[in-house]
């Protein structure tokens, strides 16, 4: 894997810097490195593809070295270099695709394609070794079963979940009280509602709670907490739990009271925040517990009192909500996040070449399914294919 990264890094630098008019002295070190790559690869044969619709391709390396010059690089020099660069880039692209579409239930962190296994040989270590990529660094750690650490921005840690629970219900669905939520990606939105605006509740207050368990532990997380849930701030028609009917939800938004968010690890509270909004942090956690209250306003203008009458019908429904968004965090496991395209790269290649469903990944690389059942085998394979996707993205956009 590190050899594949070093190949890609050398080719990217060569493609960017070996251009007509450049002083040879400015790129002499790069050309020496480029020539070392050619010397190492010459005389070797590789085969890629042969799975799904990914075609079989044979690769043979027999290239001349780039020479020295005292002057600027001319058009002939650059054209010779470009022909070599283009062949190598095409090779790296096909090795990456061949690796991204393969999976294994055992030792999925190790190279799975014949071409990448061959590149792992000791003779190829002479290619400019470069371990500067976070993905390569963590791949090496995971390969040795040592602790890894990925930094993610808006990590897709929450499987998609959208539903509701009713704490008070009746067949007519005209005086409901309960909680509804939407968990997806890096965000939780939860709303508590009471059609009667807590008119008969103790102290005219309804208590709500929402607990979310993560599939992986996050550490050093920066989090935004807001006293609102905008996705539940407009009228909607909702299917009943049994699917027999529908009910109408017409929210009027109040500010939540006594808001508390707890971050837990293995059942132990690590961080707690009360009535604190904006940016907060959490050291390490695998569970988030949100609790908040809907309190009937003790004093209301006539216009507000008209919204919340003391008896039915309740045409407007008192609602309070919270939004919790994980902006950045560190995780030992690889995840999809907002700043990278690794999941899209892997999925698109597998779809384009009609790769059959294997023993590890779900059909279509469905992320909700994948993260919901994030087994060690999936973790190993996902880290490997994401590492390869990061290498491919250096050359192929």
Curated annotation (Swiss-Prot):
GO cellular component: viral envelope; viral intermediate capsid
Binding site for Zn(2+): 153
Ion transport recorded as keyword: no
Single biological process term from Gene Ontology: fusion of virus membrane with host plasma membrane
Keyword GTP-binding included in the entry's annotation: no
GO function term, MF aspect, one: metal ion binding
Binding site for Ca(2+): 266, 286
Post-translational modification: The N-terminus is blocked.
Major place of residence: virion
UniProt xrefs under InterPro entries: Capsid_hemagglutn, Rotavirus_A/C_VP6, Virus_capsid_a-hlx_vir
Entry's localization field: Virion
Gene3D superfamilies in UniProt: 2.60.120.170, Viral capsid alpha domain
Region described as Interaction with the inner capsid protein VP2: spans on this chain: 62-73
Keywords: Calcium, Capsid protein, Intermediate capsid protein, Metal-binding, Ubl conjugation, Virion, Zinc
Other remarks in the entry: The VP6 trimer contains a zinc ion located at the center of the molecule. The zinc ion is not essential for either trimerization or transcription activity of the DLP. Zinc-depleted VP6 has an increased sensitivity to proteases.
HAMAP family the record matches: Rota_VP6, Rota_VP6_A
Family of the protein in this entry: Belongs to the rotavirus VP6 family.
Subunit (UniProt): Homotrimer. Interacts with the inner capsid protein VP2. Interacts with the outer capsid glycoprotein VP7. Interacts with the outer capsid protein VP5*.
Role summary: Intermediate capsid protein that self assembles to form an icosahedral capsid with a T=13 symmetry, which consists of 230 trimers of VP6, with channels at each of its five-fold vertices. This capsid constitutes the middle concentric layer of the viral mature particle. The innermost VP2 capsid and the intermediate VP6 capsid remain intact following cell entry to protect the dsRNA from degradation and to prevent unfavorable antiviral responses in the host cell during all the replication cycle of the virus.
Protein name in UniProt: Intermediate capsid protein VP6
Organism in which the protein naturally occurs: Rotavirus A (isolate RVA/Sheep/China/lp14/1981/G10P[15]) (RV-A)
């Amino acid at each position: 894997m590190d050899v594949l990264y070093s190949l890609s890094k050398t080719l990217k630098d060569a493609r960017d810097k070996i251009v007509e008019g450049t002083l040879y002295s400015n790129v002499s070190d790069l050309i020496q490195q480029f020539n070392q790559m050619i010397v190492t690869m010459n005389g070797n044969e590789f085969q890629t593809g042969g799975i799904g619709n990914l075609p079989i391709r044979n690769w043979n390396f027999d290239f001349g070295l780039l020479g020295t010059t005292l002057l600027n690089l001319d058009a002939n020099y650059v054209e010779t270099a470009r022909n070599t660069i283009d062949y190598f880039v095409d090779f790296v692209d096909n090795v990456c695709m061949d690796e991204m579409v393969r999976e294994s239930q055992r030792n999925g962190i190790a190279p799975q394609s014949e071409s990448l296994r061959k590149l792992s040989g000791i003779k190829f270590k002479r290619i400019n070794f470069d371990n500067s990529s976070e993905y390569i660094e963590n791949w090496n750690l995971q390969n040795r079963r040592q602790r890894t650490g990925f930094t993610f921005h808006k990590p897709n840690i929450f499987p998609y979940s959208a539903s509701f629970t009713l704490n008070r219900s009746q067949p007519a669905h005209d005086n409901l009280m309960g909680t509804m939520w939407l968990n997806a990606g890096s965000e939780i939105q939860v709303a508590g509602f009471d059609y009667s605006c807590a008119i008969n509740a103790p102290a005219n207050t309804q208590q709500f709670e929402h607990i979310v368990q993560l599939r992986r532990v996050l550490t050093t997380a920066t989090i935004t907490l807001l006293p609102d849930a905008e996705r539940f701030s407009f009228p909607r028609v909702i299917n009943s739990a049994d699917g027999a009917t529908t009910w109408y939800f017409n929210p009027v938004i109040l500010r939540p009271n006594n808001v508390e968010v707890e971050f837990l690890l293995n059942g132990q509270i690590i961080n707690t925040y009360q009535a604190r909004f904006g940016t907060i942090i959490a050291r390490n956690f695998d569970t988030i517990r949100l609790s908040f209250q809907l309190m009937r306003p003790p004093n209301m203008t006539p216009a507000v009192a008209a919204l919340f009458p003391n008896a039915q019908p309740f045409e407007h429904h008192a609602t309070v909500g919270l939004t919790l968004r994980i902006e950045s965090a560190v995780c030992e496991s690889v995840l999809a996040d907002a700043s990278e395209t690794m999941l899209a790269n892997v999925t698109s290649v597998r779809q384009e070449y009609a790769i059959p469903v294997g023993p590890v990944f779900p059909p279509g690389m469905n992320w909700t399914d994948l993260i919901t059942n994030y087994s060690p085998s999936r973790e190993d394979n996902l880290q490997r294919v994401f590492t390869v996707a990061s290498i491919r993205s250096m050359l192929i956009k």
